[in-house]
Amino acid sequence: MTLSSRFTLPGQVQAVATADPSGPLTVTSYGANPLATVITSVDLSGTVAWQRTYPGTGRPQSRLSTDGTLWVAYPDGDGQLLESVLPDGSTGPTARPECRPDEEIGAFVLLDDGFVISWVSGSRLVREERNRPMSVPEPRVARYAQEGECLWSTQIALGPVSFPGVVEMGDRTGWEIRPRRPWVPEEIGVDHWEPLLASADRIAASFTDTRGGIGRTFFLDLDSGETVSATSPAPTGRKAIAGPGQFLIGSQGYGAFTTGRFDRNGAETARWASHGAMLVDKDGRVSGPELENRLPSRSRFRRLAPDNTLVDGPALTGYYTSYPAMDREGTAVFWRDGKLLTVDTDLAAHELFAMDDSRAVIGRALLLSEGSVVVSLDDEVLVFRTPLGPLAQGPWPCGEANLQGNPLLS
């Protein structure tokens, strides 16, 4: 178990993906300008093949297809452009989905025949840079053909939100701490974690009050755009594809610490008293490192049993954690507290590498060929050699959702 290479990118890394387990890597990062998006093609030794810079929104957006074509979303004039970058760095086809001047792409997913996009109000940075009025359009989800033709568009009504753990204090409460009454969000954005997932004939699109952190997930029919169901307002959390048309929706904060499984009808079929970066294997078993906003840590690696109970794995120190990957033997690998850790099927933990590092911005772990594991820490990419086997096949985040970083289960 060795650190085989490490290399620095122009800015904080937002995404690392590859179309082939042997590389090269396609890295999406910020540039020196926080509104710039930089795309870098680099091999596992750190040798750069090409690099391109795009205007951004403060939220670099990209998705990699199975053939190695990267799609980048960025503002262009008064609209938004989806541009493809071919494996050699040249420009491929583009799509210009119709939108309002004050809208931007909050998240998108590549489909086999087009795109699904979550639209939100343009970021404050972009609106201020362009001297635009601070209008706040309602969010929406839309599906497009490959050329950009809109097939359907569905408005999202987040509505008034509230949660029992949210409190307020002021003149209205006589300066006493009381539960906050339901409120209408002033600004709505896509959720920070896994905001848009597509599985079989269902979409899970998550939107949140950007100031209060209370949000909802909306389940839509992929073919028609019809809203099938929506979760109740709750603190946002990690999410995953749990199977065809099925999703895991987590909630963490204000006293919430749960994960629910939802079927294709949007009905909750299971709920666990745990929240984390969960893996779902080919048999539908769920496990992963817990993520809780507290120190000292009381998190563990947990297995979420079918009867809604928890199976305890090893205790986890520290706080900041990468999303894990899993090999075909069922061993999970992830970065936490300055260590590269594995947890095997017996729930035994093993430390593969450690260094004094407390960086807070950590990308997901990618498991590549010959046991190579890639993790990004802030503006740096680290490549490790490990004894792990090939990447497992399963709904999340194995297979395409792991390597390509495109949350789609066809």
Feature-to-residue mapping (PLM):
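An edge-strand/N-cap motif at the start of beta-rich repeat modules
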Residues: M1-G46, W396-P397, A401, P407
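A short beta-strand motif characteristic of beta-propeller blades
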Residues: L3-L9, T47-T53, T91-E98, C150-T154, ...
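Repeated scaffold domains used in trafficking and secretory/extracellular systems
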Residues: P10-A19, P55-S65, R100-D112, G159-R172, ...
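Short coil/turn segments that connect the beta-strands within blades of beta-propeller domains
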Residues: S22-G23, D67-T69, D112-G114, A200-R202, ...
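Short, conserved, GDST-rich strand-edge loop motifs in beta-rich repeat architectures
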Residues: Y30-G31, V120-P137, F207-G212, L291-L295
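Loop/turn-rich, solvent-exposed surfaces of beta-rich toroidal or solenoidal domains
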Residues: P296-S297, L310-D344
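Blade-level signature of beta-propeller repeat domains, shared across WD40, Kelch, NHL, RCC1
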Residues: A360-S410
